[in-house]
Amino acid sequence: GDSFNTYIPGNEKTIQEWMTGEKAEINKKMAEEANGISCCLYEYYISYYSEFKEKAKYLPLPINLQEHPLRNIPKYPEQVQFFIGIQKDRNELKGTDRMLNVLQKLARDYPDIVKIAKAVSVPYQEYKQMMYGSDILLDQLYSYTPGMNGLIAMAKGLVVIGGGEPEMYDLMGEQENRPIINVLPDEQD
């Protein structure tokens, strides 16, 4: 659906380009000529399904668990380290600016318990090392589906806060195991 787009300030131009501009024309032509459309996120699947339901197939992102072994996390840690990765040029698009504001308030309210690891536009290997040393990953705010970082974090045993909408689980046929703490673009959530 369109509802998540309305949360992203300044996204109107990008939406317009993909809905009616040159990018839309090229994308539609490729979809028409393709034998199939592999959609790795709920958002991609739903975007193609209305016009190309015979071609659109949901194929979740694969994770090699041997490359990301589960780590030991204490059941009741004295402190909880939250990890947030920020790409300066995509901060508003992913909602990390809003998530960071809430996280900083939480750290001010509970300074002895809440710790923040913040990666700002760092190389991916450094990003992963910082993430692996944390307990909770704050992923994308405006997504219905976790991306690779969210999936890798869960494989390592971290709690993930981000996109985990019911529609995504329904598409996968999953009715019971819903491990992501889903948040809405509302600071009270």
What would you call each of these model-derived segments?
Residues 132-145, 158:
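Acidic donor-binding loop of glycosyltransferase active sites
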Residues 63, 67-94, 100:
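Conserved donor-binding/catalytic core segment of Leloir-type glycosyltransferases
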Residues 128, 150-155, 169:
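Short alpha-helical segment that forms part of, or immediately flanks, the ligand-binding pocket
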Residues 159-166:
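Short hydrophobic beta-strand element within catalytic cores of glycosyltransferases
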Residues 80-82, 97-126:
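A conserved nucleotide-sugar
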